[in-house]
């Protein structure tokens, strides 16, 4: 899933 550290977690 989204990596820890990215502020804008945009799931495509």
UniProtKB/Swiss-Prot annotation:
UniProt tissue specificity: Hemolymph.
Gene Ontology CC annotations of this record: extracellular space
Family: Belongs to the tyrosinase family. Hemocyanin subfamily.
Physiological role: Does not function as a hemocyanin.
Quaternary structure annotation from Swiss-Prot or TrEMBL: Hexamer.
Protein name from the UniProt record: Pseudohemocyanin
Taxonomic source organism: Liocarcinus depurator (Harbour crab)
Source taxonomy: Eukaryota, Metazoa, Ecdysozoa, Arthropoda, Crustacea
